[in-house]
């Protein structure tokens, strides 16, 4: 069962940081299984999920968040909003150094906001859209000036959302092509040591880390294990101490006395996996076709047989873990193949002599559950006369096909929806987030003036009750227009050795910095 907020809080309490002063490193090596070899090791420029685990150890965020939802100091020691919500002042921690010895300063923050997050990050484009400029009155003060309020902005200042990059290494370059993306100079508890493409990424303890006595582990090794069955086997033999496994293996691994299974359903890491349509394809411009696909898919079957009950059927683009904003009273599409057939007939897509209406392709994100979901959808759509070819490819080719070449009909895509709808969910539906080449953004090319107004109103509304109403309207529009079909609100399941302790030190879970972890 998913950890409740109270249970997760207890877990955090049990893994609380040791006192900084006088603490000594514990040493040792932690080996983490990673499903694929990321192209980049900084998520400042990308929201690809395979980047987060390693990148969050190399870069600290300006803030972090406790399980109680309250912000905590990291690179920023103090923060304050102006009364009108149009200025956010950050007082930075003195003495922080980049891994090359250069001082961390407000100039790095200003550069990252203005030249990186707003321009190149799929989530950052909407998250920081209201930030007009960043003033730096002194090296340890950054003042974000906004055109309109952004009540969610503090939530975006964590490492997994908005990593500050070193201005002295990026300014004047094309950030996307900067060689430091593959071998970062960060400011976090671990430093980049080396990578062996397709094999492993090695990080070492940062001896100059600002939090004295941390990190407590000497070395992190991210071992590339593309086969999830191989991850389970490596956990069982002790070859790796932390990893994500096929959900079909979880029940078996729970019985292993040397392992522990953590299932976390929290807003910071909540996700909705969905079927996306390429709305540039003429066939999908007809709403009846999209509705037919929704009625042809049994999401309960997917939850039971592919996700093995780890999550819930998604009836909204906002996952239930985001309790403040989730609403279930929106248009839904029950499993009804007969209705799907009638809608396809009404759209003029009648069966031919061979019983076929359409022949299309479906591209799943690389990963066991997405691929199995695509295979199930192929089977389900075949029953209503739609032939789908499942195309499998590596991660880089998938991203290029969907977001750069736009050479796809449908795709199975998952992505972090939190910690706030303006940060994680809006990117899929906001017309201004359509930009070929930017991964995991508005890949459907959905554009609706009414939707944009709802999202932009919610993005700036300071009254919590009014903001919830804007997001209710958003959910109703999303489920009415149906540019993507929410399938499963998945919980995050990780398996670890019981020797690994204190690795959760924030609401970011395994995407925290591991400064307190011991093995």
What does each model-found stretch correspond to?
Residues 207-253, 266, 378-379, 387-389:
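Ligand-site clamp/hinge motif
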Residues 37-52, 75-76, 102, 153-162, ...:
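A structural "hinge/loop" feature
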Residues 33-83, 114, 185-187, 306:
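N-terminal lobe/hinge region of extracytoplasmic solute-binding protein
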Residues 77-121, 137, 143-147, 234, ...:
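Aromatic- and charge-enriched surface segment that lines or borders ligand/interaction sites
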Residues 70, 158-215, 219, 229, ...:
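Gly/Pro-rich hinge or "lid" segments in bacterial periplasmic/extracellular proteins
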Residues 278, 313-347, 366-372:
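Structural transition elements
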């Amino acid at each position: 069962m998913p950890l409740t907020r109270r249970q997760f809080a207890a877990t955090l309490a049990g893994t609380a940081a040791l006192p900084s002063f006088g603490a000594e490193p514990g040493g040792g090596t932690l080996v983490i299984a990673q499903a694929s070899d990321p192209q980049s090791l900084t998520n400042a420029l990308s929201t690809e999920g395979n980047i987060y685990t390693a990148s969050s150890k190399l870069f600290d965020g300006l803030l972090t968040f406790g399980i109680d939802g309250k912000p905590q100091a990291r690179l920023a020691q103090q923060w304050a909003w102006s009364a009108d919500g149009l200025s956010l002042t950050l007082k930075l921690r003195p003495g922080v150094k980049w891994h090359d010895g250069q001082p961390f300063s407000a100039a790095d923050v200003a550069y990252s906001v203005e030249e990186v997050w707003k321009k190149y990050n799929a989530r950052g484009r909407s998250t920081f859209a209201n930030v007009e400029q960043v003033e730096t009155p002194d090296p340890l003060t950054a003042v974000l000036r906004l055109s309109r309020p952004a009540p969610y902005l503090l939530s975006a200042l964590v490492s997994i959302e908005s990593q500050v990059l070193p201005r002295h290494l990026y300014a004047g370059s094309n950030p996307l092509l900067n060689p430091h993306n593959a071998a970062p100079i960060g400011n976090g508890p671990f430093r980049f040591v080396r990578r062996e493409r397709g094999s492993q990424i090695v990080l070492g303890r940062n001896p100059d880390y600002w939090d004295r006595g941390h990190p407590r582990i000497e070395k992190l090794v991210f071992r590339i294990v593309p086969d999830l069955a191989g991850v389970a086997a490596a956990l069982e033999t002790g070859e790796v101490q932390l990893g994500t496994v096929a959900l079909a293996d979880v029940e078996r691994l729970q019985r292993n006395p040397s392992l522990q299974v953590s299932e976390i359903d929290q807003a910071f890491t909540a996700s909705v996996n969905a079927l996306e349509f390429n709305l540039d394809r003429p066939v999908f411009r007809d709403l009846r076709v999209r509705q037919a696909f929704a009625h042809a898919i049994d999401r309960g079957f997917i939850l039971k047989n592919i996700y093995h009950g780890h999550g819930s059927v998604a009836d909204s683009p906002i996952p239930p873990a985001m309790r403040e904003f989730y609403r279930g009273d929106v248009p839904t599409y029950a499993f009804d193949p007969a209705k799907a057939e009638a809608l396809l007939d009404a759209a003029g897509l009648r069966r031919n002599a061979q019983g076929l209406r359409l022949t299309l392709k479906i591209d799943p994100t690389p990963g066991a559950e997405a691929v199995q979901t695509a295979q199930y959808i192929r089977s389900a759509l075949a029953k209503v006369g739609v032939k789908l070819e499942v195309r499998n490819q590596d991660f880089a080719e998938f991203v290029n096909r969907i977001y750069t070449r736009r050479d796809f009909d449908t795709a199975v895509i998952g992505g972090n929806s939190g910690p706030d709808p303006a940060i994680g969910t809006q990117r899929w539906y906001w017309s201004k987030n359509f930009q070929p080449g930017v991964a995991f953004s508005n890949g459907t090319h959905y554009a609706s003036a009414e939707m944009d107004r709802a999202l932009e109103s919610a993005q700036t509304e300071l009254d919590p009750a009014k903001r919830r109403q804007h997001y209710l309207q958003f959910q109703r529009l999303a489920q009415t227009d149906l540019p993507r079909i929410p399938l499963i609100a998945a919980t995050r399941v990780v398996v670890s050795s019981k020797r690994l302790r204190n690795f959760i030190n924030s609401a970011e879970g395994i995407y925290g910095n591991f400064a307190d972890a011991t093995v």
